[in-house]
Amino acid sequence: EAALNGMANGALSGAVSGAITGGITGGLSYNSGATSAGKGFDTYRQLKNEIGSPGAGNEWHHIVEQSQIAKSGFSPQMIQNTNNIMSISKTTHRAISGYYSSVQPFTDGMIVRNWLAGQSFSAQYEFGINVIKMFM
């Protein structure tokens, strides 16, 4: 969470820092109780079988990335969870994935997904929502 505060102090664009300092609001559909609610699954395939298609031209996007099962030690049920996934356009999904693979000024030379490793689920979830807002 301290790292998120550092981002809000100017490392990211005004839109994202505003979202971080102003809280999560706007037109995004997500469940802020993702850390304690939702239906969890052992695999992504099981989750997709439950939720179905993301819709034409869309893909499923994990708010806290699947890589964080290994990197942060989160359980599959936390990541493969109905409260940790949303349908976004393929174009937006590719842009977000590229961002998570990039080095940003606030990541101390690490790619974003590695910088996130070890932060709490709730901090990563809030960060993920703010990244989605930045690209939508």
Over which residues does each language-model region extend?
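Generic alpha-helix signal with a bias toward terminal, lower-confidence helices
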Residues: A19, A70-P76, F127-G128, K133
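Betabetaalpha-Me/HNH-type nuclease active-site subdomain
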Residues: N31-S102
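Catalytic cores of phosphodiester-bond-cleaving enzymes
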Residues: M86-M136
